[in-house]
Amino acid sequence: NGSDHRFRFLRRPLVEYSPVTEKHLTDGMTVRELCSAAITMSDNTAANLLLTTIGGPKELTAFLHNMGDHVTRLDRWEPELNEAIPNDERDTTMPAAMATTLRKLLTGELLTLASRQQLIDWMEADKVAGPLLRSALPAGWFIADKSGAGERGSRGIIAALGPDGKPSRIVVIYTTGSQATMDERNRQIAEIGASLIKHW
């Protein structure tokens, strides 16, 4: 099983913010463990190692194109991909494109049922997105999400949520070009989320 293959990365330099992989320099991690670290903890080294397994950023972009997303592109690795330089098309997407892609991944036939459920489980277990949409979620609502942050005030989240315990609604929010602090950006996204939920 490829997901149980163990990667040893003692000689591979860790990149900034790698809270899980930095603890496994001697014993390594499986692909499954790297996926969990990248999604639930936003571990940057885990993301880079996973990119390596599929052939790098260009292969991820090709995969997205093959599933119909001709907008989203990944050109670089962590942490350089977070630069968010104005008018730079590298490492970018658009909310509508990402919403469609997320819906296909979570509810379409692109992945097997088991893989879809595993992805949802990892996103549901997200440990670093608490101050964002989760803080505005009504009691009993389901949420599976993945947040991100970058330079120049960039902050974002993609989420599947719903009142029925299922990922029935897709939300994608991106902000950039802001002087706001991280806490302020988190509150802004939470407020946008609260407004969306109020109108559903």
For every predicted segment, state its role:
Residues E22, T53, T100-P131, A136-F142, ...:
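Structured C-terminal helix/loop/strand segments within mature extracytoplasmic catalytic/sensor domains
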Residues T30, N48-T107:
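Mid-domain, small-residue-enriched loop/turn segments at the edges of structured enzyme/sensor domains
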Residues N1-P13, P57, T61, T112-S115:
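Short, well-structured active-site flanking segments
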Residues L10-R12, I39-S42, T53-I54, R76-P79, ...:
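Active-site-proximal beta-strand/loop segments in catalytic clefts of secreted hydrolases
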Residues L14-L49, P57:
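Conserved catalytic neighborhood of penicillin-recognizing serine enzymes
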Residues R6-R8, L49, I170-V172:
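Soluble periplasmic/extracytoplasmic beta-strand elements of cell-envelope proteins
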Residues A38, L64, V171:
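Terminal peptide-recognition signature
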Residues G2-D4, L64-D69, D88, T93, ...:
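Extracytoplasmic
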